[in-house]
């Protein structure tokens, strides 16, 4: 299993350690006597365990490099607050800026402002399309649409005929793209898909909403959640109402509780985009750009998706509990 992962992600390891191309023009010059400060702003909600792992990756990289990293995110999925955070960060004139961009229209003005001030930018996790408008060093994440296709392929193997899709962040372009890919493949195979939005901050409400939906839609035999904030309360619900495990539950991303659910048979698979890498790699790449003007040859560095299921869940359980997977 270890050899399999090394082979799959070797290109990313090489990109971190080797000079791969000349950089684009930038007016900033590196002063070796000046402490490097990188600012990172993501849309990760305070209650979302996915982003605690991503921030761990960024912080680990900054410690190993001996540079300063400042990480922040809104309490909730709030693009107004996030844009204000980005504007405030720009005013501090950081050496580099790392951003997730889940809503391009809402964040465009702030990102353009950073670019005009010659602050180097790396985008992670969401919003790779912004590279068509703004000079971005690279994007670190996965193709969400392709990940949706992959989720559908795995779900079809379970023989499902009617699927419920749970969206915990309405307006997040990444989740929309996941759903689009998922829905496309299932529709082509005559599988119906219905989407229900939830309030990620209220797990109890999520459970009751899904309970009511399943009660009135008894043909549903599959559920896909677009992230752990949807999956965790539904796992607990299905343990109560579906002990025979007739409803096949799958999710994007994972936490220790998701891994436990896979090992217990309550979750059939999780799609892994390696958020630790999405935090770690941008800090390394930004530091290389600031100090040595290195940039990746490829505009997108893909960290996923891969499948975590009963066959390999044990391999990542301890790492997930440690906060690095």
Question: In which residue ranges do the predicted regions lie?
Answer:
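Flexible loop/hinge segments that line or gate small-molecule binding clefts
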Residues: 104-146, 253-263, 267-268, 317
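Short, solvent-exposed amphipathic alpha-helices that sit
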Residues: 49-64, 147-151, 173-192, 209, ...
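C-terminal motif of bacterial Sec signal peptides marking the signal peptidase cleavage site
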Residues: 18-21
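Hydrophobic alpha-helical segments within soluble ligand-binding/sensing domains
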Residues: 138-164, 205-207, 254-258, 274-291
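Extracytoplasmic "Venus flytrap"
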Residues: 37-57, 61, 65, 70-86, ...
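Hydrophobic alpha-helical
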Residues: 98-115, 182, 200-261
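Structural motif
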Residues: 69-93, 196-217, 231-233
């Amino acid at each position: 299993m270890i050899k399999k992962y090394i082979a799959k992600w070797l290109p990313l390891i090489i990109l971190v350690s080797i000079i791969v191309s000349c950089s684009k023009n930038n007016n900033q010059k590196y002063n070796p006597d000046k402490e490097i400060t990188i600012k990172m702003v993501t849309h990760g909600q305070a209650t979302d365990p996915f982003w605690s792992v991503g921030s761990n990756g960024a912080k680990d990289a900054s410690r190993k490099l001996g540079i300063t990293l400042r990480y922040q995110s809104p309490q909730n999925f709030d693009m107004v607050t996030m844009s204000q955070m980005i504007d405030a960060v720009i005013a501090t004139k950081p050496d580099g800026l790392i951003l997730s961009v889940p809503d391009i229209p809402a964040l465009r003005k702030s990102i353009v402002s950073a670019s005009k001030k010659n602050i180097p930018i790396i985008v992670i996790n969401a919003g790779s399309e912004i590279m068509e408008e703004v000079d971005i060093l690279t994007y670190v994440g996965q193709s969400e649409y392709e990940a949706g296709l992959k989720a559908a392929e795995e779900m079809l193997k379970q023989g499902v005929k009617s699927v419920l899709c749970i969206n915990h962040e309405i307006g997040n372009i990444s989740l929309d793209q996941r759903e689009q890919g998922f829905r496309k493949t299932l529709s082509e195979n005559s599988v119906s898909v219905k989407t229900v939005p939830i309030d990620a901050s209220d797990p109890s409400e999520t459970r009751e909403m899904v309970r009511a939906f399943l009660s009135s839609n008894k043909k549903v035999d599959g559920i896909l959640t677009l992230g752990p904030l949807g999956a965790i309360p539904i796992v607990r619900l299905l343990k109560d109402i579906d002990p025979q495990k007739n409803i096949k539950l799958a999710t994007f991303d994972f936490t220790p509780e998701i891994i436990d659910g896979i090992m217990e048979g309550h979750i059939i698979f999780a799609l892994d985009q390696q958020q630790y890498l999405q935090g770690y790699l941008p800090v390394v790449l930004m530091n290389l750009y600031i100090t040595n003007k290195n940039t990746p040859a490829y505009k997108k560095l893909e960290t996923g998706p891969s499948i975590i299921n009963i066959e390999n869940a044990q391999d990542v359980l301890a790492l997930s509990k440690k906060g690095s997977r």
